[in-house]
């Protein structure tokens, strides 16, 4: 996972970006294969300890999933989750999960931003992103 970009890049070969069901993954984006209703989901687990950089008494962790579609042509916030950790905690771990269903157009792109990418857990089992097709017409594009 590349954390130096304004969006997160995922390792599609190890399984932390889920690209089943016709999705393509390209440069941090999940590309929607066809028009329909999709369940979009994201979990990011953060880890750290008090010796790592933390300003103030607490750190606010925030994840966001954005959508870019050809019809709107602007990044739109779809999902967001946030929580806080106290800066004096030793060896802390915090998982943030969010999911919801949306009507998406074919070729729309989903991407993720994290407030603190340097604290994302290195074990891919705890951090994942994807979408599942729920309903729609297979021939719709």
Residue ranges and their predicted role:
Residues 1-21, 66-93:
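Conserved, structured regulatory domains from eukaryotic proteins
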Residues 1-35, 39-52, 124-141:
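Terminal (often C-terminal
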Residues 29-33, 54, 93, 103, ...:
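Amphipathic alpha-helical protein-protein interaction segments
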Residues 34-35, 67-75, 103-109:
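A short, structured loop/turn motif at beta-sheet edges
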Residues 43-47, 70, 117:
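Solvent-exposed coil/turn segments that connect beta secondary-structure elements
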Residues 53-63, 125:
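Short coil-to-beta strand junction motifs in C2/discoidin
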Residues 86-107:
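Short, surface-exposed tryptophan/glycine-enriched loops
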Residues 112-119:
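Short beta-strand-plus-loop segments that form exposed binding edges in beta-rich domains
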């Amino acid at each position: 996972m590349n954390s130096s970009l304004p969006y997160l890049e995922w390792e599609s070969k190890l399984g932390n970006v889920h690209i089943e069901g016709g999705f393509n993954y390209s440069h941090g984006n999940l590309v929607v294969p066809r028009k329909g209703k999709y369940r979009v989901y994201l979990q990011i687990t953060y880890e750290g300890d008090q010796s790592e950089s933390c300003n103030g008494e607490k750190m606010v962790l925030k994840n966001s999933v954005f959508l870019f579609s050809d019809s709107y042509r602007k990044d739109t916030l779809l999902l967001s989750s946030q929580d806080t950790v106290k800066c004096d905690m030793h060896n802390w771990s915090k998982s943030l999960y969010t999911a919801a269903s949306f009507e998406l157009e074919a070729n729309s792109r989903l991407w993720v931003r994290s407030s603190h990418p340097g604290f994302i857990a290195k074990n891919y089992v705890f951090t994942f992103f994807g979408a599942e097709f729920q309903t729609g017409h297979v021939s719709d594009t």
